[in-house]
Amino acid sequence: MKYTSYFLALQLCLLLGFSGSYGQGPFFKEIENLKEYFNASNPDVATGGPLFLEILKNWKEESDKKIIQSQIVSFYFKLFENFKDDQVIQRSMDIIKQDMFQKFLNGSSEKLEDFKKLIQIPVDDLQIQRKAINELIKVMNDLLPKSNLRKRKRSQNLFRGRRAST
């Protein structure tokens, strides 16, 4: 388990480090603390390749990239939750979480609460599964791009108008 944690901490360091603001954010020192704590600079951490970086490279468009980033941020929030009682790294994790919160959720506490609610939902609960399936059609409709939805409604209205006039 510790090896996995070390590897994940290294990935966090790399992800945040290569995000374009390496060394400029308040999290730089805290990432170094986590790297030391998890021994994430050890060469064996690189075994198997990167965890997230290759995936991030595959997603070019900003809106698409946000989808992947949300999953990655969710992962790190869960990782930090697993170590919440570890006083040695608590300050570092809090600072990094706050920086992620500012960057990813634009500092919106409402968005943060919603995000936390989503990552806490247990998928093995039957009642949750039933609710999720019940809401699936609405969720799928919400996934449709808004412009396509308007185009489809417009073309349906045109088609109906032609049918009525013949």
Swiss-Prot record:
Instruction: Give the record's GO CC terms.
Output: extracellular space
| Residues with glycosylation annotation | 39, 106
Q: In which tissues is it expressed?
A: Released primarily from activated T lymphocytes.
Single annotated GO MF: type II interferon receptor binding
According to the UniProt entry, which residues carry Pyrrolidone carboxylic acid?
A: 24
| Stated role | Type II interferon produced by immune cells such as T-cells and NK cells that plays crucial roles in antimicrobial, antiviral, and antitumor responses by activating effector immune cells and enhancing antigen presentation. Primarily signals through the JAK-STAT pathway after interaction with its receptor IFNGR1 to affect gene regulation. Upon IFNG binding, IFNGR1 intracellular domain opens out to allow association of downstream signaling components JAK2, JAK1 and STAT1, leading to STAT1 activation, nuclear translocation and transcription of IFNG-regulated genes.
Protein name, per record: Interferon gamma
